UniProtKB/Swiss-Prot annotation:
The lineage of its organism: Bacteria, Pseudomonadati, Pseudomonadota, Gammaproteobacteria, Alteromonadales. The gene is aspS. This is Aspartate--tRNA ligase. It comes from Shewanella woodyi (strain ATCC 51908 / MS32). One of its GO terms (molecular function) is ATP binding. It is found in: Cytoplasm. Residues 197-200 are annotated as: Aspartate. SUPFAM superfamilies: Class II aaRS and biotin synthetases (SSF55681), GAD domain-like (SSF55261), Nucleic acid-binding proteins (SSF50249). ATP binds at R219, D220, E221, Q228, E483, G535, L536, D537, R538.
Length: 595
């Protein structure tokens, strides 16, 4: 039905007859000539109909937005004065000779102009229309190019594309599972996988030493801009490769994607330990475009007569750190109060500040509500430590170390945006040497990555003797403050795996019930293996500049995990529930909603 895509017509086709199909993006009658912008997934081209062909012209005059049409015409160059530099096809146009309406369109329920706003609910309800818009179509096409490039790279590197089950068993991976009832085993449930973690490890045990899969995963968790209940991973696992080799191979893949698809050279990725990232940036996924760093000052304020500072400064689990913001002294008291309110979201009790109004005036040039608690020597030491200059602002965080890191790390990002401090377009890095475990709110231990991650260089006995000192052989790839992917060397013997389960409070009976198949498999010559999983949606979001992963998925869910297009989720047929042996118990809230 067509000779090429609309967006592919160019000056090399001048003088040729082409046949195109697509949708009417815009139609206008200017002085007896109809100008038609025809759109398909590859772009937009201008078609011109004049009255010399009255039958065709009359049909063209009836066209409205989103009519689906077939066009035949002659490609001609536009006059220099009419060239549209904003269009890929802006140097040519089609002189229309034929026109067939393949389908008309009802009045549109959403606005297709990119400059007009539609609510997200409207966009998702009429997603098939929303996806016709060039910015959305471009992202979906780009996504396909990324997955094709990933497959080519991994295929060429000897990896095998192997599918793993979707109906599987619940595993403790940090989020709630989506459960699927079994009809044949009444009262029992499958779980949709949060990742193919255990199956890809079993594939290593099966001898398939290089595996990958572009796979759907499911997590029933609270949603944010970068979260969806179903999402796509680039899942990779290898045998007989060290963490350094896995990082090198996957870095090569990502650098290739950016180079081939965006013409961007990311360069070699620097490595940073978890401890350094938390100390300098308050985050294990630091945005290195932001030049601000957390500066420790506990040693300076240990002796001050101000409990807010000296308490955490003398507490082994406390921390006192500052951010020095160039030009920040111009902030009003109201703006500083907003910053103070902002850090309370992350557990901080408040935010002290100091303005350096005039460095040459000594203490007279310093303004701060806590200045009365600080001696001139302390203030001088603070200024020396931070390198603050006239016009700068110093913000203080003092609390437990984890609260200071989280609150000041978040404030660092906010200040970087507010003061337009971000430098460079792309700043990748590897974060390595994570702790094996972290403390939970009830004082227990939780695996920082997952319970199948191997520690670095210790025995099971040493691990159990001091689990909080253990460092995992894990690594995260971070770009512009977003975690692109994370992975680790896996535990490959049953003694170490059992030790980790015991540390996590998983007793032998529970371990055998949930992971008996894994512990059994580990007894039969399991090779050393390691892997990594990338969040495909997040990679596409970053590469296309989208503000949400919902804008790079064809049919995403809302932030409440619903689909306005299909009205999913919905109520099940009572007969199906009976067959499954399920009874729905209504809570008071749902009864009130139905009333």
């Amino acid at each position: 039905m067509r000779s090429q895509y609309c967006g592919d017509v160019n000056k090399s086709h001048v003088g040729q007859e082409v046949t195109l199909v697509g949708w009417v993006n815009r139609s206008r009658d200017l002085g007896g000539v109809v100008f038609l912008d025809l759109r398909d997934r590859e772009g937009i081209v201008q078609v011109v109909y004049d009255p010399d062909l009255p039958e065709v012209f009359d049909v063209a005059s009836t066209l409205r937005s989103e009519f689906c049409v077939q066009v035949t015409g002659l490609v001609r160059a536009r006059p220099d004065s009419q060239v549209n530099q904003d269009m890929r096809t802006g140097g040519i146009e089609i002189l229309g000779k034929g026109l067939t309406i393949l389908n008309s369109s009802a009045p549109l329920p959403i606005n297709m102009d990119k400059n007009q706003h539609n609510t997200e609910e409207q966009r998702l309800k009429y997603r098939y229309l929303d996806l016709r818009r060039p910015e959305m179509a471009d992202r979906i096409v780009f996504r396909s190019k990324v997955t094709s490039a990933v497959r080519r790279f991994l295929d060429d590197s000897g990896f095998l594309d192997i599918e793993t089950p979707i109906l599987t068993k619940a595993t403790p991976e940090g989020a709630r599972d989506y459960l699927v009832p079994s009809r044949t085993y009444k009262g029992q449930f499958f779980a949709l996988p949060q990742s193919p973690q255990l199956f890809k490890q079993l594939l290593m045990m099966s001898g398939f030493d290089r595996y990958y899969q572009i796979v759907k995963c499911f997590r029933d968790e609270d949603l944010r801009a970068d979260r969806q209940p179903e999402f796509t991973q680039i899942d990779i696992e290898t045998s007989f490769m060290s963490s350094e080799q896995v990082m090198a191979k996957t870095e090569e893949m990502v650098r290739g994607l950016f180079n081939d698809l965006l013409n961007v050279d990311l360069g070699e990725f620097p490595k940073m330990t978890f401890a350094e990232a938390m100390r300098r940036f308050g985050s294990d996924k630091p945005d290195l475009r932001n030049p601000l760093e957390l500066i420790d000052i506990a040693d300076i304020v240990k002796e001050v007569e101000f409990a807010v500072f000296n308490g955490p400064a003398n507490d082994p689990e406390g921390r006192v750190a500052v951010l020095s913001i160039p030009g920040g002294a111009k902030l009003s008291r109201k703006q500083l109060d907003e910053y103070a309110k902002y850090v309370t979201i992350y557990g901080a009790k408040g935010l002290a500040w100091m303005k350096v109004n005039d460095l040459d005036q000594g203490m007279e040039g310093i303004q701060s509500p806590v200045l009365k608690f600080l001696s001139e020597d302390v203030v001088k030491a603070l200024l020396d430590r931070t390198g603050a200059q006239t016009g700068d602002l110093i913000l203080f965080g003092a609390d437990k170390a984890n609260i200071v890191a989280e609150a000041m790390g978040a404030l660092r990002l906010k200040a970087g945006e507010d003061f337009d401090l971000l430098q460079g377009e792309w700043k990748p890095l590897w974060v390595v040497d994570f702790p094996m475990f972290e403390r939970t709110s009830d004082g227990g231990l939780h695996a920082m990555h997952h319970p199948f991650t191997a520690p670095t260089g210790i025995s099971p006995e040493q691990l159990e003797a001091d689990p909080t000192a253990a460092i995992s052989d894990a690594y995260d790839m971070v770009l512009n403050g977003c975690e692109l992917g994370g992975g680790s060397v896996r535990i490959h013997n049953s003694e170490m795996q059992s030790a980790v389960f015991r540390i996590l409070g998983i007793e032998e009976e529970e371990a055998n019930e949930k992971f008996g198949f894994l512990l059994e498999a580990l007894r039969y010559g399991t090779p050393p293996h390691a892997g990594l999983a990338f969040g495909l949606d997040r990679i596409i979001m970053l590469m296309t500049g989208a503000s949400s992963i919902r804008d790079v998925m064809a049919f995403p869910k809302t932030t409440t995990a619903a689909c306005p297009l299909t009205n999913a989720p919905g109520f099940a047929n009572p007969a199906q529930l009976i067959e499954l042996g399920i009874e729905v118990i209504e809570n008071q809230e749902s009864k009130e909603e139905q009333a």
